Amino acid sequence: MVVKIGIIKCGNIGTSPVLDLLLDERADRPNIDVCVVGSGAKMNPDEIERAVPTMLEMERDFVIFISPNPGAPGPAKARELLSAADVPAMIIGDAPGLRVKDEIEEQGLGYIIVKADPMIGARREFLDPTEMASFNSDVIKVLAFTGAYRVVQNTIDAMIADVEAGKAPELPQVVIDTDKAVEAAGYTNPYAKAKAMAAYEIATKVADIDVRGCFMVQDPDQYIPIVASAHEMLSAAAKLAIEAREIEKANDTVLRTPHGKEGKTLSKKDLLAKPE
């Protein structure tokens, strides 16, 4: 059986660029068919009203909508459209989504909230395309090496397994905090685990500082160094995440969870071992 998955990307968070790739890392998984529709960097209601209906015209077993701030007007419109549609759907968002998770549940939708997927320092004086790309590369490193992406992978794989079993997919209600992320990372060395925990906690705080610099402070002489400091924090978090993985590599205990020939999730730690 081939499970048909729809992914709608509107705006961008650090999970967005790799979401579909987490499900098919070698592009050879036989049991899923993934279609992605998006609206680029923008997520206003107008973009949403084009992107979501486009996806709903397709035959999908379930749909995932990913964006920053699920409570913002555009994502709120997406939730409204998906709630009214005859297809199981879930929302993936960043920490502001915590404020509307009860509302998401009431709409009959699932959710994954990634607390350490932080808002970027979107001030024109500071953020250019190079800085934007650097920020997102740091987010990806943090979320990959702290285990957050594995939580996303496992959660969606469970939905795929439900569909394969002939059941409606169980819609998740997952908040990825430090403990949940690092548990999924499977660190063996306690120092590696501590570094990963520190990385996730720092990344979680980055959003608070960027919100202050982007919305609460109006003097450029103040908000420019504020958002710059948030990006420096994230860079430090990425370095800690890399250090955590390097410790595990030195001990040959890196947990890897590839998808097998039939699409099932396998596991291994020894580098030269076959995944089982």
UniProtKB/Swiss-Prot annotation:
InterPro entries: MTD, MTD_sf. Keywords: Methanogenesis, One-carbon metabolism, Oxidoreductase. GO terms for biological process: methanogenesis, from carbon dioxide; one-carbon metabolic process. Activity requires salt; 100 mM sodium or potassium salts of chloride, phosphate or sulfate are equally effective. Not inactivated by O(2). Inhibited by hydrogen-producing 5,10-methenyltetrahydromethanopterin hydrogenase which has a higher affinity for their shared substrate. Enzyme is O(2)-stable and strictly dependent on coenzyme F420. Its EC number is 1.5.98.1. GO terms for molecular function: ferredoxin hydrogenase activity; methylenetetrahydromethanopterin dehydrogenase activity. It catalyses: 5,10-methylenetetrahydromethanopterin + oxidized coenzyme F420-(gamma-L-Glu)(n) + 2 H(+) = 5,10-methenyl-5,6,7,8-tetrahydromethanopterin + reduced coenzyme F420-(gamma-L-Glu)(n). Belongs to the MTD family. Found to be tightly associated with methyl-coenzyme M methylreductase. This is F420-dependent methylenetetrahydromethanopterin dehydrogenase.
